[in-house]
């Protein structure tokens, strides 16, 4: 096997994820020679704005995809939730490895459970999806935007006027934070995850047979089916970062997929949700999307997209 170059965002989390995946590859192919090339993306350069205000899909992947096309790198290791639902022609997701915990972590300054926070408590999050679901369940709380990496957010929780913050459990775990700092992991009934949350997507050129053969050795087919249902739903709903959208699929021992799709307004007041079981992930994603459109969810998406 030739020497491989892996493209990664420059953040600590991205580099850690990349190294962890490289270790996984070396476990099945010990003689691999792999180097990481750090790439700065548009999303990394914008640190002072709410990402949904910046607009556009693929804020964290476009520059990396460009490097793949230019053959400066052989593969890219993305957080799947950052990858738009349509992959450019000539590129492919070569594998979906094992999924980390897909839920969100709730961290309270005083370790107060979410349901017991006093009225007017301020929760920091960078996601419309989290904000909308929290306001829907706990309209007495306030949402305040927070940006920055995990360390920055944990520091802001202590030094600024946040009572709690919510962030992806997967990032905390991959960075080696212990469960001690987490007040609770929020289950799907409290906070339905983002599309592809906790999963990685390994992107490469579609014609790179040698690499695709290697990647197939660390591919998790069950996770791939689940995230395919989620990403199909995202594509069908035309969900952009202006829309609070969530979707989560699980697979049973009998290989049946259960998928829940959710669309909300940012204030949490309108909620469209549907759960369905099936065996074909693409059909499942499409059908749940159609059900939500019948309920009126598409009107919300059109309205929110037009406002930006």
From Swiss-Prot:
It catalyses: 4 porphobilinogen + H2O = hydroxymethylbilane + 4 NH4(+). Pathway: Porphyrin-containing compound metabolism; protoporphyrin-IX biosynthesis; coproporphyrinogen-III from 5-aminolevulinate: step 2/4. Signal peptide: none annotated. InterPro entries: HemC (IPR000860), Porphobilin_deaminase_cofac_BS (IPR022419), Porphobilin_deaminase_N (IPR022417), Porphobilinogen_deaminase_C (IPR022418), Porphobilinogen_deaminase_C_sf (IPR036803). GO terms for molecular function: hydroxymethylbilane synthase activity. GO terms for biological process: protoporphyrinogen IX biosynthetic process. The modification S-(dipyrrolylmethanemethyl)cysteine is found at residue 241. GO terms for cellular component: cytoplasm. It holds the Pfam family Porphobil_deam. Its cofactor is dipyrromethane. It comes from the Bacteria. Its EC number is 2.5.1.61. Keywords: Porphyrin biosynthesis, Transferase. Binds 1 dipyrromethane group covalently. The keyword DNA damage does not apply. Tetrapolymerization of the monopyrrole PBG into the hydroxymethylbilane pre-uroporphyrinogen in several discrete steps. NCBIfam families: hemC (TIGR00212). Belongs to the HMBS family. The porphobilinogen subunits are added to the dipyrromethane group. Monomer. This is Porphobilinogen deaminase. It comes from Staphylococcus aureus (strain JH9). The gene is hemC.
